[in-house]
C-alpha cells in the first residue's frame, strides 16, 4: 500500500455540515474552521483503496492519483471529496434502492424515474451520478487547452466561439448561489446548452429546467474547493478549466448525440 505524507506548518481542518435552510429545502454547507495545530502530518492514501459496501453500484475508479491535479485541486481536497463524500453518496444510494425495482436499473434510468419527493433517493442518486461524471471531466495533463473536433464545431455554432462558451460557463458557475452544479448538456434536439442545478439535482431529472444529457460537470459545493480556495469560487472555476479532459468531453458529446439520433 503506497502512501505519501505532506508536512504543513499549520493545518486547517474544515468540517462540512449539510443543512436544510429555507422553504425550498436548499442544501448549503456550514464551514467550521478550528484553530490550527502545529506540525500536523497528513497521510494521503490511494483512491484504489476506497471501496463501497456491497450493492448495486460501486465507485467509479478515479483515473488519477489524489495529488495528480495539484495545484489546481490539491490532494487533501480530492482525497476528502472522493473517499468521504462520493463514498457516502454511493453507500447511501445502495441502501435507498435495496430490495426495490431500482436495484436492476442503470443510474440514468433511476434519475429519470425517481420520485422527487423522496429526498434520500434524489440526493444520493444525484450525488452518485454527478460525481461519477465530474471525475472523468478532469485529467492531470490535458491533450488540448480547449474543445476539439466535433465538439469545437458545435461550440462555434451554438456559442459563437470556444471563448464565448468559456465565458458563459464561468458566468453561470459564478451566479449559482449555494450548493449545486453547472453543466454543459446536449438537449433533446441535439443542441449544446449550459445550465445549472441546485444541490445534487441534474439535467436527467424530471424537474430539470433544461433537460438533456450532461457531457461536462463542475461541482459547486463548497467541499469541492474550500480547502484550496476558501471563498474564492471564481479561482476554483478558473483552475477547473486548466484540467478539463477535452478528449473525454468530446467522446461524451458524440455519445449524447447518438442518444438523440443526431449522429
Kindly label every feature range from the protein language model.
Residues 73-87, 108-129, 209-215, 219:
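Alpha-helical scaffold segments that form or flank carboxylate-/histidine-based iron centers
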Residues 1-9:
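Bacterial N-terminal signal peptides that target proteins for export
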Residues 17-20:
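C-terminal motif of bacterial Sec signal peptides marking the signal peptidase cleavage site
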Residues 84, 95, 99-104, 112-196:
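All-alpha RGS (Regulator of G-protein Signaling) helical domain and cognate RGS-like helical scaffolds
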Residues 174, 179-230, 238-244:
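An amphipathic alpha-helical core segment
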Residues 22-24:
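Bacterial signal peptide processing site
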Residues 232-236, 240-263:
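Low-complexity, Gly/Ser/Thr/Pro-rich intrinsically disordered linker/tail segments
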Residues 42-65:
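Acidic, low-complexity proline/glycine-rich segments
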Amino acid at each position: 500500500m503506497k502512501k505519501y505524507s505532506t508536512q504543513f506548518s499549520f493545518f486547517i481542518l474544515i468540517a462540512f455540515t449539510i443543512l436544510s435552510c429555507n422553504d425550498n429545502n436548499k442544501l448549503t454547507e456550514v464551514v467550521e474552521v478550528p484553530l490550527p495545530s502545529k506540525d500536523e502530518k497528513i497521510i494521503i492514501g490511494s483512491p484504489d483503496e476506497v471501496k463501497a459496501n456491497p450493492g448495486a453500484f460501486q465507485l467509479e475508479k478515479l483515473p488519477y492519483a489524489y495529488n495528480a491535479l495539484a495545484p489546481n485541486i490539491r490532494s487533501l481536497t480530492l482525497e476528502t471529496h472522493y473517499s468521504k463524500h462520493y463514498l457516502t453518496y454511493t453507500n447511501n444510494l445502495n441502501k435507498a434502492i435495496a430490495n426495490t425495482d431500482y436495484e436492476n436499473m442503470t443510474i440514468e434510468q433511476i434519475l429519470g424515474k425517481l420520485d422527487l419527493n423522496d429526498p434520500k433517493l434524489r440526493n444520493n442518486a444525484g450525488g452518485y451520478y454527478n460525481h461519477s461524471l465530474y471525475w472523468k471531466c478532469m485529467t492531470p495533463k490535458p491533450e488540448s487547452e480547449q474543445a476539439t473536433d466535433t465538439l469545437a464545431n458545435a461550440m462555434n455554432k451554438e456559442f459563437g466561439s470556444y471563448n464565448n462558451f468559456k465565458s458563459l460557463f464561468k458566468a453561470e458557475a459564478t451566479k449559482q448561489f449555494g450548493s449545486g452544479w453547472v453543466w454543459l448538456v446536449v438537449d433533446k434536439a441535439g443542441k449544446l446548452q449550459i445550465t445549472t442545478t441546485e444541490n445534487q439535482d441534474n439535467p436527467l431529472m424530471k424537474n430539470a429546467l433544461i433537460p438533456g444529457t450532461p457531457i461536462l460537470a463542475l461541482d459547486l459545493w463548497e467541499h469541492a474547493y474550500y480547502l484550496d480556495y476558501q471563498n474564492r469560487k471564481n479561482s476554483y472555476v478558473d483552475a477547473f478549466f486548466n484540467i478539463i479532459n477535452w478528449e473525454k468531453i468530446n467522446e461524451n458529446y458524440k455519445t449524447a448525440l447518438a442518444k438523440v439520433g443526431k449522429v
